[in-house]
C-alpha cells in the first residue's frame, strides 16, 4: 500500500474549471487573514487542502504558485518575493501527496497539517522573512507557538471538511 500519492488527474476542461474555482476561493479566503505581516492567521488553507485532495501534488503545487502570483499582482502594494510562492507550492504539494486518492483519516490529516505547518510555515516562511531583513531570533518562537496552537485547530477543521467532501464527492 502506497502511503503518499505522487499522481495527478488528467487536466480536462472540467478539472480546470474546478481548479479555477478553488483558486478564486483561496484568493477570497486569503483576504480574511489577520495578524502582523510575520504572524498571520488565514482560512485560505481550506482551498489549498481541497486543491491537493482533488488534483494531487503536481497540479495543486502549480495552481498554488500561480495563485500566489495572481494575489500579489492584484492585492500587494509591495515587492514580490519568490520564497513565499515556493512555500505556497510546497504546502499544496504536501497536501496533494497526503490526500489525493487516499482515504481521509485523523492520523493522515494530522501528519499532513503538521508537515505543512513545520516545513512551509515555520521553517521556510521564517527563512524568507529572515532573508527579507526580519531577524529570525525575534520571530521563530512566536511563529512556532502560533503553529503549535493552530495544529489541532487546523487538523480538526481539515478533517471535518475532507470527510464532508468525501461523502459528496461521488455525487459531483
Curated annotation (Swiss-Prot):
Membrane-spanning residues: 19-39, 44-64, 81-101, 109-129
The organism of origin for this protein: Lacticaseibacillus paracasei (strain ATCC 334 / BCRC 17002 / CCUG 31169 / CIP 107868 / KCTC 3260 / NRRL B-441)
Assembly behavior: In Lactococcus lactis subsp. cremoris (strain NZ9000) forms a stable energy-coupling factor (ECF) transporter complex composed of a membrane-embedded substrate-binding protein (S component), two ATP-binding proteins (A components) and a transmembrane protein (T component).
Compartments it resides in: Cell membrane
Protein name: Folate transporter FolT
InterPro entries, alphabetized: ECF_S_folate_fam, ECF_trnsprt_substrate-spec
Upper classification of the organism: Bacteria, Bacillati, Bacillota, Bacilli, Lactobacillales
Membrane topology listed for this record: Multi-pass membrane protein
One of the record's GO cellular component terms: plasma membrane
Function: Folate-binding protein that interacts with the energy-coupling factor (ECF) ABC-transporter complex. Unlike classic ABC transporters this ECF transporter provides the energy necessary to transport a number of different substrates. The substrates themselves are bound by transmembrane, not extracytoplasmic soluble proteins. Binds folic acid with a dissociation constant of 9 nM; binds polyglutamyl folates less well. Upon coexpression with its energy-coupling factor (ECF) ABC-transporter complex EcfA1A2T in Lactococcus lactis subsp.
Keywords assigned: Cell membrane, Folate-binding, Membrane, Transmembrane, Transmembrane helix, Transport
Gene designation: folT
Amino acid at each position: 500500500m502506497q502511503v503518499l500519492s505522487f499522481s495527478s488527474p488528467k487536466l480536462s476542461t472540467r478539472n480546470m474549471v474546478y481548479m479555477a474555482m478553488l483558486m478564486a476561493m483561496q484568493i477570497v479566503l486569503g483576504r480574511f487573514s489577520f495578524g502582523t505581516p510575520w504572524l498571520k492567521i488565514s482560512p485560505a488553507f481550506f482551498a489549498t487542502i481541497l486543491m491537493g485532495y482533488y488534483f494531487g501534488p503536481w497540479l495543486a503545487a502549480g495552481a498554488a504558485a500561480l495563485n500566489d502570483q495572481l494575489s500579489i499582482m492584484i492585492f500587494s502594494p509591495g515587492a514580490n518575493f519568490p520564497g513565499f510562492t515556493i512555500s505556497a507550492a510546497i504546502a499544496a504539494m504536501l497536501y496533494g501527496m497526503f490526500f489525493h486518492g487516499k482515504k481521509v483519516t485523523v492520523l493522515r490529516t494530522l501528519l499532513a497539517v503538521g508537515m505543512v505547518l513545520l516545513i512551509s510555515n515555520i521553517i521556510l516562511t521564517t527563512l524568507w522573512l529572515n532573508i527579507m531583513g526580519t531577524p529570525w531570533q525575534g520571530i521563530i518562537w512566536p511563529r512556532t507557538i502560533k503553529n503549535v496552537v493552530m495544529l489541532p485547530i487546523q487538523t480538526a477543521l481539515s478533517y471535518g471538511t475532507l470527510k464532508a467532501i468525501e461523502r459528496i464527492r461521488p455525487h459531483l
